A protein has these predicted regions:
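Conserved glycine-rich FAD pyrophosphate-binding loop
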Residues: 2-4, 39, 64, 71, ...
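N-terminal glycine-rich flavin-associated loop
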Residues: 14, 33-66, 83-85, 89-133, ...
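Helix N-cap motif at beta-to-alpha junctions
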Residues: 49, 227-229, 274-281, 330-334, ...
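A generic structural motif
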Residues: 103, 266-275, 359-368
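C-terminal substrate-binding/cap subdomain adjacent to the FAD-binding core in PCMH-type
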Residues: 144, 163-321
């Protein structure tokens, strides 16, 4: 895009693919689709998979960068060097098939999480996908990020609920992996490479997903403890027991201030959500006994879990300069990881709120400046460095939210993966010219 004629040519080619009305060029629209402040040259909204393939093919041939986008609700990654094209998937929003008897549903990537939830709920079924903004969030975006919420404990990671994907590779080829039903999923599981690859290997265009019978009823049991060690001991007791909760969460005293209901005491909280018949929930009440300090059900329960899911959003709304980190460690290392986070926060004049899945040890850590106001960038950089240095080598520590000026001084992803050669080989095979999401992910 060095000359005026080249720009006119690209505009014409983009418009020929999607139609002039779906080529967005106004300054205000382009600004709304900026990525970490980097404004795109063009925003396009394809309506079919063929249009997606044609757009990626054009970008590949013209050596342009292309960034897939869903509902803009969970963008994570490094600041891109430049953004030529943002490809918005929200016009690809159909439910292609739904078979309640087989517990499967096929949806286009731009379908909203809310619309799919509502479709399966009409048949008393459940899609275990939880995001802070289900109306704008898209299925493709959730898959690209491998996003999950509290239901991850009971239903497993999202990749286990994905039966098949259709996608467009970095050179514009339409492809698929997996199938429509469980028995058809065989061979090399390429789709599991795409889930969580943040759009750097391919543009996801459609997905076949497993759904689950919705529980007859749910009830949430809350246990408050004076110390972190007591909360971890309770977690261990639950994990060793016959109980199989849908959700099993932990929250620090500060994290609870962002929930819809919290204790006024400085206590650590463990939350279990049980689903099933009256007999099942009665079993939980009996087995948990005096450890339970609160019980939520019906509307109060829904409000409570929505606030837990919205934790990162609520922190950012109240503290715009906060830094939120997604942390994953071995379950046996959870207490140590939290204690390290609290120590490095204190050393750098920060507060830290912890909330997340305590059985699988996947947490959100919200670092908040103290006193309130704009933090010194070095505070966050030093805290993040010390946190990563103090954790096991296999721990994952990813910055999911921070101010732009902070991102310029920290590595969002952390240390380069040990299997980087294999990752580069996959990238070369699917996106050899580095068209997709350039500069955003670990490679």
């Amino acid at each position: 895009m060095n000359t005026g004629s080249a720009i006119i040519s690209i505009e014409s080619e983009l418009a020929a693919i999607v139609g002039r009305e779906y080529l967005r060029e106004s300054a205000s629209v382009l600004a709304r689709h900026a990525i970490d402040g980097v404004v795109p040259e063009y925003v396009v909204e394809p309506g079919t998979e063929d249009e997606v393939a044609a757009l990626v093919r054009l970008a590949n041939e013209r050596k342009l960068t292309l960034y897939p986008e869903g509902g803009r609700t969970g963008q994570v990654g490094r600041t891109p060097p430049r953004v030529d094209i943002v490809l918005v998937t929200t016009r690809l929003n159909t439910i292609e098939h739904y078979d309640p008897g087989d517990l499967t549903i096929g949806v286009a990537a731009g379908a909203s999480v809310l619309s799919v939830r509502e479709a399966v709920a009409a048949n008393n079924q459940l899609l275990p996908v939880e995001v802070a903004h289900p109306a704008p969030s898209t299925i493709g975006g959730v898959l690209a990020r491998a996003a999950y919420g509290p239901l991850r404990h009971g239903y497993g990671p999202l990749r286990d609920s994905c039966l098949g994907l259709r996608f467009v590779t970095g050179d514009g080829r339409l492809a698929k992996s997996g199938g429509r039903v469980v028995k058809n999923v065989a061979g090399y599981d390429l789709m599991k490479l795409l889930i969580g690859s943040h759009g750097t290997l391919a543009v996801i265009t459609a997905a076949n997903l497993k759904v689950y019978p919705a529980p007859q009823q749910t009830r949430t049991f809350v246990a408050d403890f004076a110390s972190l060690s007591e909360a971890i001991a309770f977690r261990d007791t639950v994990v060793r027991s016959p109980l199989t909760p849908m959700c099993l969460e932990i929250a620090s005293p500060l994290a609870q201030e962002f929930f819809s209901s919290h204790s006024d005491r400085q206590t650590w909280r463990v939350m279990l959500r049980a689903g099933g018949s009256d007999a099942v929930t009665a079993r939980y009440a009996r087995d948990l006994g005096s450890a339970v300090t609160h019980v939520f059900e019906a509307q109060a329960e829904e409000q409570y879990w929505n606030s837990v899911i919205d934790f990162g959003e609520r922190v950012s709304a109240r503290h715009q300069n906060a830094m939120v980190v997604a942390l994953s460690v071995a379950p046996s290392e959870l207490q140590h990881a939290i204690e390290v986070a609290e120590r490095v926060a204190n050393e750098n004049n920060l507060l830290v709120a912890c909330s997340g899945r305590c059985a699988i040890a996947a947490l959100n850590l919200a670092f908040i400046p103290m006193p309130q106001g704009a933090p010194v960038v070095t505070q966050y950089a030093q805290a993040l460095t010390r946190l990563r240095e103090s954790l096991a080598p296999d721990a994952a520590c990813v910055v999911t939210r921070c101010a732009d000026q902070v991102k310029q001084h920290v590595d969002v992803w952390g240390a380069t993966a040990t299997d980087v050669d294999a990752m580069r080989a996959v990238k070369r095979a699917l996106d050899g010219n580095d068209v997709l999401n350039r500069g955003r992910f670990v490679l």
